[in-house]
A protein has these predicted regions:
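Bacterial Sec-dependent N-terminal signal peptides
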Residues: 3-80
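Conserved, mostly hydrophobic/aromatic
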Residues: 134, 238, 251, 285, ...
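Extracellular/luminal regions of secreted and cell-surface proteins that mediate adhesion/ECM remodeling
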Residues: 408-543
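Active-site groove signature of glycoside hydrolases
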Residues: 204-227, 234-271
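N-terminal substrate-binding region of glycoside hydrolase catalytic domains
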Residues: 77-226, 345-371, 379-396
């Protein structure tokens, strides 16, 4: 029952589009190819046609084969045949890049076979089959141990391990973590992760009371001019190192407060800086990060939230489910056409024991509330479970079917709903046109450019010729719950070899993150939610 509910809850968005012609290399045989696409929604319809006189004959590896069946149509010009393809949804969980679930990945040791909850551990933790990016935290004082000195070595080791497992990373650098304040005698460096040199050159700190255990603790003065100067200097260095790095999914702006969450609710005596200072920090981050997605932490609200959106900085919330209405707070970012990010109020095991007492407590985790949080907030990025101990092991064992289904709801999810190949043989040429309809059945747009390619392939899956042109779909334009129609045309002059007529030839569809990846012969990285996916991530159409 929950599976059907999860798959049915999607939201509507406005549609807009643009498309650019893509030049392909010429083949040895003269053919003409063109592509067009149409956006279908209740508000707009746009058609953009592309044309050229070229075809790509790049090769791929695949072990699948398919021969189409055809039917002739009377009354149409020339000798017309049609192949209508049978389409079904992909059976099982479906992960895709730049969206999805995460679990804590503290360091490269997460991938060591000796860690039983890791992807190679003895427990065979199935949660990792749903994980598309790692998350955790870095300490400012470790990355920046001295003035002008930066040590990225441990972070680089983690990024390399994640890349080897086809995962990105959500980067969060904390200046402070009260979680490690045990008592009033706890060494400051255990929880205050502001580099020592910042204080040595004049930044101020105060003593505050940690409400969790009444311990006295040192806390930075968040609006101190020296602190602000070096917080910005670190941001500049971080951008110089990682802005635009494809291994990074997004970067939180974590300059203030407990865990860098822009609040000091557990530190009696500490105060957040003014709204203007908060805005100024966001402005600085936006000025040095030109490519990577930036995220405003959970407690950035009101004017700060509005200002962040104006800078292209999206929003996260770290207390979904537990506090009523938190998912609604992310709708503003979704409506600004930005990906939304979230965690829950606590780990799965903890949230099962919440009392449902509001006020005075938190709402407990239930499957219905989990689905509602994802769909209400139109989430693109979400923690599967934030328990650092078991990396989602218990959660996944308890909720496998539902969790698998939500991989196709979270973020974008492209499904080919109809596909037909129409071939018209005339006196001068033969034209084959592939018409398809694709729907985004997820709860959010796709927030990166995607490149759609149609190809004729032989019985081994080897690409013989590109059908039409590569179609670029700009980021943010393929809205959730919207459909788009695409046409790919391949024309061959009479008397010239026509690969479409060769025995065993079929059609494949592919989605790439870049045009260069296709031209370079790489496999696509984005997968359709359809039966017929090959080992190289291409979709083989079946009649």
């Amino acid at each position: 029952m929950l599976l059907s509910v999860a798959m049915g809850l999607v939201a509507c968005g406005d549609d807009s589009s643009s498309s650019a012609a893509v030049e392909e290399s010429s083949s040895s045989e003269p053919v003409q190819s063109s592509s067009s696409w149409t956006l279908s929604s209740s508000e707009s319809r746009v058609t953009d046609s592309l044309s050229s006189s070229s075809v790509d004959t790049s090769r791929v590896n695949s072990s699948s084969s398919l021969t189409g069946t055809s039917s002739s149509q009377a009354g149409e010009p020339g000798d017309t045949t049609r192949i209508t393809y049978a389409l079904k949804r992909f059976d099982g969980p479906l992960t895709n890049p730049h969206k999805g679930f995460t679990v804590p990945t503290e360091a490269a040791w997460t991938f060591d076979p000796g860690f039983e909850y890791g992807p190679h551990g003895s427990l065979n933790n199935g949660a990792w089959n749903l994980v598309t990016y790692g998350s955790g935290y870095q300490q400012w004082n470790k990355l920046n141990p001295a003035k002008g000195v930066y040590d990225w070595s441990e972070l680089e080791e983690l990024l390399d391990a994640l890349t080897a497992h086809n995962m990105g990373y959500a980067l969060r650098v904390f200046p402070y973590s009260p979680s490690f304040i045990r008592d009033s005698n706890t060494p400051e460096e255990n929880y205050d992760w502001t580099p020592k040199y910042v204080y040595e050159v004049g930044a101020k700190k105060i003593t505050a009371r940690y409400k969790d255990n009444n311990a006295n603790a040192a806390v930075p003065v968040w609006d101190d001019s020296v602190y602000l100067y070096y917080a910005k200097e670190f941001a500049t260095a971080l951008a110089a190192k990682y802005d635009g790095d494809p291994r990074i999914e997004y970067i939180d702006v974590r300059s203030f407060g407990e865990w860098g969450e822009w609040h000091v609710s557990n530190l009696d005596g500490s105060k957040m800086p003014s709204v203007e200072i908060q805005k100024d920090m966001l402005k600085h981050y936006a000025s040095v990060f030109k490519k990577s997605l930036l995220v405003l932490p959970s407690d950035g609200y009101g004017d700060v939230y509005t200002y962040a959106l104006s800078l292209g900085i999206t929003k996260r919330d770290d207390c979904l489910i537990g506090i009523p209405g938190t998912a609604d707070s992310l709708v503003r970012a979704y409506e600004a056409n930005m990906p939304t990010v979230a965690e829950n109020c606590g780990g799965y095991a903890i949230m099962l024991n919440y009392t449902d007492m509001i006020p005075g407590g938190y709402l407990k985790w239930t499957p219905e509330r989990w689905v509602d949080a994802i769909t209400t907030a139109h989430l693109t990025y979400y923690v599967l479970d934030q328990d650092f101990d078991d990396c989602g092991y218990r959660f996944y064992n308890d909720n496998k079917e539902l969790a698998d289904s939500m991989t196709k709801v979270l973020g974008y999810n492209f499904t080919v709903e109809s596909a037909e190949l129409v071939t018209v043989a005339g006196a001068k040429d033969t034209t084959s046109t592939l018409n398809i309809t694709v729907k985004n059945t997820g709860v959010a747009p796709c927030f990166f450019d995607i490149y759609m390619v149609a190809e004729f392939v032989d019985s081994t899956g080897r690409a013989l010729a590109q059908v039409g042109e590569t179609v670029r779909i700009p980021k943010g334009t393929f809205k959730d719950d919207s459909s788009q129609n695409f046409s790919f045309t391949y024309k061959v002059a009479s008397g010239k070899p026509d690969v479409a007529k060769q025995s065993g030839v079929s059609v494949s569809l592919s989605l790439y993150e870049s045009e260069d990846a296709f031209k370079g012969g790489k496999n696509p990285t984005v997968r359709f939610d359809n039966d017929g996916l090959q080992g190289n991530n291409k979709l083989l159409l079946k009649p």
